[in-house]
Amino acid sequence: MRVFTLAPLALLPLVLARPSQRSSSPQKPIMADNGDLVMIPEGHEKSNLDEIIASSELLSLHRSLSEIESISNNEGSVGDFLVEYLERHGFTVQKQAVPLDGHEVDEEERKPSRFNVYAYPASSPSPEIILTSHIDTVPPYIPYSLSLPPTASTGSSSIDRRAIHISGRGTVDAKASVACQIIATLSHLESNPDTPLGLLFVVSEETGGQGMHHFSNSPLNTSPPTFHTVIFGEPTESKLVSGHKGMLHFDVHVRGKPAHSGYPWLGRSAVSEILPILSKVDSLGDIPESEGGLPSSEKYGKTTLNIGVMEGGVATNVVPASASARVAVRLAGGTVTHAKETILAAVRSASKNPEDVHVSFSAGGAYPPVDLDSDVEGFDVMTVNYGTDVPNWDIHDHDLPDHGKVKRYLYGPGSIFVAHGENEGLSVGDMEDAVEGYARLIRAAVGRSERK
């Protein structure tokens, strides 16, 4: 294992550039002022913001990751960067080829176009604690940029460096988690080199979780588990997540009979048939379960539905011969089977011509609410409504007693509210706080290792 000297975790937030040796330069050096305040000469804001990022191992790693476009199916370049970075810092790295979404594995291809990255210190080939996140992003690519909110200025020549805002696609979801997990791991290993830590960075989380499914079905997912803790990274506002809603997708297809719109009684309108069905479906989260609605729970609230896509008809002067809709369900309780039965019953009750209506559920990706561990002190705790890769990793601990089951934590910097938007971004302070949060989770997991 190569020796790597990393600034102690406590020093990571404030690794500032050294003063320039060129006394003739009109630009004053960046200087620490009262902890997180930094002197910025007027007119040099951009260059000095860049310098602050470059002077921090955490922030420069995050910038390098975010500057590489890695929209789902195009994660190869960011994977190559991670492999080189982790090997340079003493990790043994395995690349796990993952076929592109909708494609088969090309066995003849020597270099996979994309791959999961699985890494561990040479001294610990069987990690007991694994930190994981994803390296793909949603489209479109938005370049990395830095800005200084007006509230960050504390005077004519100083700013609060923690308030520096970092923007761009993936800066939050989830390259912030990736960078913070790596730095927290390196910092822990610097003083505890024998800790059995591992890192797993997967592709395709945003498009169905093929990367995590691929890892889950591989020999690396040991049975029974050789690991006892998994720390998942997603934007959680640096709060510990005690669980998230389940997920179910389905399509409604309606067949009609075309006719001239001047004589609609000669046909059957598929649109007129699907509208009351969708109205009924859309209300299932607000109907009590005892009256045919979908379940709610104290922990997750109501089940919610989103009719995301509707299609029907070909022209205004033609009675529509077909109509369809695609619906996403965020389950707050119950089982997937029960939810499907409830949806089918609602569709039947709202159909005038049930024989013309067909409901199809997505073959994969359906799961009930996911409960997670939140037993580490020092965190605010919340639930979230979005889906993650957690259910895509089938951990083989189902037959183990409760005290032997794998702990699963979900934590990370940034907010889901901006994660897929044009305003995706977070602050330097968010990043630095998350490194300490991951470090705290690692320390708690190490305590379990020592009690084994």
From Swiss-Prot:
Zn(2+) 1 binds at residues 173, 206. This is Probable carboxypeptidase CPSG_08841. GO terms for biological process: proteolysis. Gene3D superfamilies: 3.30.70.360, Zn peptidases. Zn(2+) 2 binds at residue 173. Its cofactor is Zn(2+). SUPFAM superfamilies: Bacterial exopeptidase dimerisation domain, Zn-dependent exopeptidases. Pfam families: M20_dimer (PF07687), Peptidase_M20 (PF01546). Residues 1-17 form the signal peptide. One of its GO terms (molecular function) is metal ion binding.
